[in-house]
Design a protein with these regions (language model features):
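Residue-level signature of mid-helix packing/kink "hotspots" within the transmembrane helices
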Residues: 37-45, 95, 128-129
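Cytoplasmic helix-loop-helix junction between adjacent transmembrane helices
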Residues: 86-124
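Pair of pore-lining "gating" transmembrane helices in MFS-fold secondary transporters
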Residues: 1-16, 191-210
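Conserved MFS/SLC helix-loop-helix module at the cytosolic interface between two early adjacent transmembrane helices
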Residues: 41-78
Length: 236
């Protein structure tokens, strides 16, 4: 919910920072959005190894407070380059949702794992759907900078909740033999199906995420210049 609030307001924030043309707004928004996910792809294996050694709870806490700080810093930027830089740093500390999945999968009784993961997916989807709408409304009501501050506070609250209420019975696993790709294929009968699913998910993500940096810019270009509640319309 907190993170998805930013989807409709990030391009408009660059306009407030002095980026005027639609092309430049789309470019900066694409850089800021893509920077985070690019870094996430690069550092995810590293954080995964840390989680395997230290537990998943520490990953939740690190990600929550790290993203909270990043969003608070974005609220005080005065140039587009500063926003992109902090979004790069945000990618370094991300990983909340993936850590949540592994934590639930490892801590929930086996007969309740499907139910728990389904509940988590429903909560994540609900937040993703409602977040842009509320984020756009808040941006029009209290200002984009204050919206970033609010997102930072929400992420900080999630960190506090993770620290206080999540209890993990984690025991590091003994060192296991590293599998080659050929051995991995032998152990997973449906390996090719999993690869196909990953490719399909990759294509789906490209289609969805390619629109996120430009949808607000597109709407700004087709509505009258004096239109109020532009962020709310974009979020809807």
């Amino acid at each position: 919910f907190g993170v998805s609030q930013l989807a409709p307001i990030l391009p408009l924030y660059f306009h407030d920072l002095g980026v005027q043309t639609p092309e430049a707004m789309s470019l900066w928004s694409g850089l800021a959005t893509g920077a985070t996910y690019l870094i996430v792809c690069l550092v995810a294996p590293f954080w995964g190894r840390i989680a395997d050694k230290k537990g998943r709870k520490i990953t939740l806490i690190r990600s929550s407070f790290g993203m909270a700080l990043c969003n608070l810093l974005i609220a005080f930027q005065t140039i587009p380059e500063g926003v992109v830089l902090i979004r790069l740093i945000q990618g370094l500390v991300s990983g909340f949702y993936s850590a949540t999945i592994t934590l639930i999968a490892s801590e929930t009784p086996i007969d309740r794992t499907g139910w728990a993961l389904g509940l988590l997916a429903s909560a994540n989807l609900a937040g993703s759907l409602i977040g842009p709408l509320i984020g756009g409304y808040l941006a029009d009501s209290i200002g984009i900078r204050n919206d970033f501050i609010l997102v930072g506070i929400l992420m900080g609250i999630s960190g506090v909740l993770a620290t206080v209420f999540i209890h993990e019975n984690y025991k590091p696993k003994a060192t296991v033999e590293k599998l080659t790709l050929s051995k991995l294929k032998e152990k997973i009968p449906e390996f090719n199906s999993i690869v196909a699913l990953c490719i399909a998910s990759f294509i789906y993500a490209i289609c969805i995420m390619s629109l996120q940096p430009v949808i607000s810019v597109y709407i700004k270009g087709i509505v009258p210049s004096n239109t109020e509640n532009l962020a709310f319309i974009s979020g809807a």
